[in-house]
From Swiss-Prot:
It is found in: Cell inner membrane. It is a multi-pass membrane protein. GO terms for molecular function: phosphotransferase activity, for other substituted phosphate groups; undecaprenyl-phosphate 4-deoxy-4-formamido-L-arabinose transferase activity. The gene is arnC. The keyword NAD does not apply. Catalyzes the transfer of 4-deoxy-4-formamido-L-arabinose from UDP to undecaprenyl phosphate. The modified arabinose is attached to lipid A and is required for resistance to polymyxin and cationic antimicrobial peptides. The keyword Lipid biosynthesis applies. This is Undecaprenyl-phosphate 4-deoxy-4-formamido-L-arabinose transferase. The chain crosses the membrane at residues 234-254, 269-289. Its EC number is 2.4.2.53. Pfam families: Glycos_transf_2.
Amino acid sequence: MNNTDIKLVSVVIPVYNEEASLPALLSRVTAACDQLSQNYEVILIDDGSHDGSTELIRDAAAVEGSKLVGVLLNRNYGQHAAIMAGFETAKGDLVITLDADLQNPPEEIPRLVEAAMQGYDVVGTMRRNRQDSWFRKTASKLINKSVQKATGVHMSDYGCMLRAYRRHIIDAMLCCQERSTFIPILANSFARRTIELEVGHAERAHGESKYGLMHLINLMYDLVTCMTTTPLRLLSIVGSVVAGIGFTFSILLILMRLILGADWAADGVFTLFAILFTFVGVQLLGMGLLGEYIGRMYTDVRARPRYFIHQIVRSATTPSQQEAEQ
């Protein structure tokens, strides 16, 4: 493949309360993209920020000749919905996603473009020497392993959003109408050729991570339930095993009662309660899992928009318009 296959590179960056990081982010992203032989645009999606991020994005995108495009959502929809809004706006033949916290270095962008030019549909990344806390690294490993088993999609680092997607992959994802979406897995389901690159990782310089404990738990549910029905099959298997154990144990209790008498049976009351609570716990877990699937079906049936773009801010002449004129 040659340079003519990628004429325009779009860098999509979701932003939520990143006022302190934005000046350095814009400077470093622009410097990295200036090294490309292709034209480029940088799309900043404001996901309902409450600080000064919205004004910074609006001002930067409105500058004459700026290659920045500001996409302002009317409220907070979440990281992946914001990225999908960026995909809808992006015009590039290659689209790169990047977090706004600068933990993944923008200087890696040329490497992703170079890898995509070798014919890969998706260029993923995995973080080298992660600078996160022990809790976040451990939780991330558990989620990665669980999702790999449940979905069958083998990726080393689901949490690293520094990735590159070819135009046809973006178009395929935009055709999907489900409300709960995890972009890396969804993209891989359409890709023929994928590759993963090691990239650097830095500590968060400003603010705090938007992914706390509950966000990580919700993310795991999203990953598993929005892409596969494996947990439902697993639940059926677990239910069958528990039912078999319960039946066997019931027969055993009857035999022990006949052999050892009523006194032995009375002494085993706490054992019965423990077993009962175990079965009830399994049932509640199964009901909760079914509720997750039913809730997602209800959300999809309502067919409400995943996001609403309040305003798009761009200069009079953007790189995508220049490409159209050529």
